[in-house]
Regions:
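Conserved hydrophobic/aromatic beta-strand scaffold that supports enzyme active sites
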Residues: 76-80, 151, 185, 216, ...
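Aspartyl protease catalytic domain
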Residues: 92-244
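Bacterial N-terminal signal peptides that target proteins for export
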Residues: 1-11
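C-terminal motif of bacterial Sec signal peptides marking the signal peptidase cleavage site
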Residues: 18-20
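A short catalytic or substrate-binding loop motif that flags glycine-/basic-rich loops and adjacent residues
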Residues: 6-7, 70-73, 143-146, 208-210, ...
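Zymogen propeptides
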Residues: 23-144
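Extended C-terminal subregions enriched in glycine
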Residues: 163, 188-189, 205-302
Length: 302
């Protein structure tokens, strides 16, 4: 009798379990709960101990020098001036000479205060009598500026840029302090101009040859100035070397052996060395004074 009751109870339990399973299976599955982000709490002691990302080092003024061998075999020295630097246009004792001597402070020799910050110095453009462009220094127009000519423009703070005068240069409200013009663009929009291939357009050369000492100045997309020179090169050689080093625009500077010069120091105020192999003048020429205009590159004062 007891055994039958146990079997009946077990059967009833089996029915209930089966019904429960059937009912559960028939019911629609509940929609999954939407996941929510879980905040992770970091103890103050651990947060304080977590390493912090180091700030990037502050940029330093420097000159990066390289050599570029062009398609026709010319070797061009290229120097890029980067970091916090300032530029100063200097009057030469002979050109512009007396026309600017009583008006400007930056004369034929690098001054003492400037010497302590001097990172590099390089030659300017043609003699003003060559008619290659105008000249303004420290707000004084020594030779009239001409529209359509490539120009190095330096503002009062020492920042520099290169552009075509009268074509977006100067910009409205731009504080022009010094301007050095020299011929037409050598590089424009990151390419040598068509005129770069016609060497006869780029000044009278010593001996009337195409391959002579030449120099040029370009600017890259970051605003850095790039100087290029060779003791034996064509205008197109300089243009192609500058483009390979990132120049978007460039101008030819002076030509012929006596005038092409780049002197650089490893650190601001350090000993200068001649950077263009075969350049004619000694590395201290601009320190003792020079007859032609030139540009100094200084470590920024601020």
């Amino acid at each position: 009798m007891g055994t039958r009751r146990s079997l009946a109870a077990a059967a009833l339990a089996g029915l209930c379990l089966t019904a429960a399973c059937s009912s559960s299976a028939a019911a629609p599955a509940p929609s999954p709960a939407r996941s929510r982000p879980v905040a992770t709490i970091v103890p103050a002691s651990r947060a304080a101990a977590s390493p912090t990302r180091a700030a990037p080092p502050a940029p330093v003024p420097r000159v990066s020098v390289s050599r570029v061998r062009t398609a026709d075999g010319a070797v061009v020295t290229v120097a890029t001036f980067s970091g916090p630097v300032q530029y100063v246009l200097h009057n030469g004792s002979g050109d512009p000479g007396p026309a600017a001597a009583g008006l400007v402070r930056a004369g034929p020799a690098v001054g003492g205060a400037e010497r302590r910050r001097l990172l590099a110095a390089f030659n300017g453009g043609f003699k003003l009598s060559a008619g290659a462009g105008g000249y303004e220094q420290e707000g004084h127009v020594i030779s009239p500026l001409r529209a359509g000519l490539i120009s190095l423009v330096i503002d009062r703070s020492g920042r520099a840029r290169i552009g075509v005068w009268g074509h977006g240069l100067p910009a409205p409200g731009e504080a022009v302090y010094s301007v050095r013009q020299n011929l037409q663009p050598l590089v424009k929009h990151g390419r040598p101009t068509p005129a770069a291939a016609d060497w006869g357009l780029w000044g009278a050369t010593l001996g009337g040859g195409e391959y002579v000492a030449r120099s040029a100045l370009g600017q890259n997309a970051s605003g850095e100035l790039i100087y290029a020179a060779s003791i034996s090169a064509s205008p197109y050689d300089l243009a192609s070397a500058l483009v390979r080093r990132g120049a978007r625009i460039a101008m030819e500077l002076d030509i012929n052996p006596e005038w092409v010069q780049l002197d650089i120091a490893r650190v601001p105020g350090g000993r200068l060395t001649a950077a263009v192999p075969g350049q004619d003048r000694p590395a201290d020429q601009y320190l003792v004074g020079w007859t032609r205009d030139y540009i100094t590159v200084l470590a920024s004062a601020g």
